[in-house]
Amino acid sequence: MQDLLFEYKRTLKQTRIQYKPLAEADESVLSAEELKDKKIIRNMITDLEYVTEWLEKGRQPGIRRAIDRRDVYQRLMIKDPRIIESFSSAMMFEPDGQVSEEDRDRIREALALLTDREKEMFLLHKVECFSYERIADLLGVKKSTVQTTIKRASLKMQRQQEEMNRSLA
């Protein structure tokens, strides 16, 4: 792959050398054939630049948000509800290490408020004790996105708890 990239870059350099005298010359001095050559060489340079950028970056040039990067925001690492359930049961411990059924129901209700994305990040941070940075690396997002999402999830659950407390009072 590197050999191919090297060859393309070398060809691009040679093509630019060929194009330079045609680009510097006044168009009124150039013959019809030289004008055609100038246009063809300019197109060749554009194509070579496109290919070298594609080979270097591994994705189509010019796309601001490539599909492989867009997919990061739709992907979930934890998809099995049983795994999420096992995390939720381990969230709060009573002194003897057992979580009461009432607490489990409260945890389930709190987690039900969250989107899959929020739930995933929240559980990785609070249950698995992953750092924001590690979660960001795992999910392919920025650290600030993880922080904001976890903060939003905590606020949602806190509001629900406050509403439940008000309704009980």
Swiss-Prot record:
InterPro entries in the record: RNA_pol_sigma-70_dom (IPR014284), RNA_pol_sigma70_r4_t2 (IPR013249), RNA_pol_sigma_r3/r4-like (IPR013324), WH-like_DNA-bd_sf (IPR036388)
Lineage top rank: taxon: Bacteria
Segments traversing the membrane: none
Residue ranges of DNA binding: 132-157
Record-level GO BP terms: DNA-templated transcription initiation
Keyword Nucleotidyltransferase: no
Coiled-coil segments: none
Gene Ontology MF: a single term: DNA binding
A Pfam family recorded for this sequence: Sigma70_r4_2
Keyword set includes Transcription regulation: yes
Function per UniProt: Positive regulatory protein that acts at the late promoter PL.
Protein name: Positive control factor
